[in-house]
Amino acid sequence: MSLLTEVETPTRNGWECKCSDSSDPLVIAASIIGILHLILWILDRLFFRCVYRRLKYGLKRGPSTEGVPESMREEYRQEQQSAVDVDDGHFVNIELE
């Protein structure tokens, strides 16, 4: 028994598709969906950092400060910056002899 399928058979001119119902709407729809899926997958792999960062953080850079006094905004900025700053006192230098 041959390992070849009924659809693909070798001929003298190379591989040839012998699909009798290639104009079937289901086959056409499946082909279109397959091509679209491939295109979307390629775009996802190319731009995944941009896409997922936008989904994670949204369009805004942070919480809305609308209606908040300027003094509270500055206090919030300082808190955020101090949370980001690295405190060198937490690190221990180990010297090997």
From Swiss-Prot:
Entry's localization field? Virion membrane; Host apical cell membrane
What name is this protein filed under?
A: Matrix protein 2
Question: Where does the chain cross the membrane?
Answer: 23-43
Q: What organism is recorded for this protein? A: Influenza A virus (strain A/Turkey/Ireland/1378/1983 H5N8)
Could you list this entry's UniProt keywords, alphabetically sorted. Disulfide bond, Host cell membrane, Host membrane, Host-virus interaction, Hydrogen ion transport, Inhibition of host autophagy by virus, Ion channel, Ion transport, Lipoprotein, Membrane, Palmitate, Phosphoprotein, Signal-anchor, Transmembrane, Transmembrane helix, Transport, Viral ion channel, Virion
Residue numbers on the Virion surface membrane side: 1-22
The misc remark on file is: When the channel is activated, one or more imidazole moieties of His-37 probably become bi-protonated.
Activity regulation statement: The M2 protein from most influenza A strains is inhibited by amantadine and rimantadine, resulting in viral uncoating incapacity. Emergence of amantadine-resistant variants is usually rapid.
Residues under site feature: Seems to be involved in pH gating: W41
What does the similarity note say? Belongs to the influenza viruses matrix protein M2 family.
Q: Name one GO cellular component term.
A: host cell plasma membrane
Q: Which Pfam families match?
A: Flu_M2 (PF00599)
GO BP: protein complex oligomerization; symbiont genome entry into host cell via pore formation in plasma membrane; symbiont-mediated suppression of host autophagy
HAMAP family for the chain: INFV_M2 (MF_04069)
